[in-house]
């Protein structure tokens, strides 16, 4: 069950780091994801900060789930973590494809968001494949 707990800790750490980044440097996140400087304003920064708080909520809930898992419920917990990574991944891959962009602001075909979405989908698959502890 150590493998499952380590994978859960990975999710917790990533969420905490992203949360700190979003709370304390929202403009940097926006520029990293290709937002033009003229669209980075206090409203956009506050929205990113809100998502930073949400990332901390994910980290805290993940920490709680990790501390309460047993051999009986570890598979269900890992499935929840896999589902969370799946949703993050689908958002990253499809968000730029579904939005209507003003002319000149269209994201590149293979942007940071798309790349991170693919990475998150891989995390989802890993979490799902390793959801059961090895039998003793």
Residues covered by each model-derived region:
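Membrane-helix boundary connector in multi-pass membrane proteins
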Residues: 90-112
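Hydrophobic alpha-helical membrane segments
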Residues: 77-95, 116-123
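Membrane-interface helix-boundary motifs at transmembrane edges
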Residues: 1-2, 66-75, 133-136
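Cytosolic juxtamembrane helix and N-cap/initiation of the first transmembrane helix
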Residues: 1-17, 132
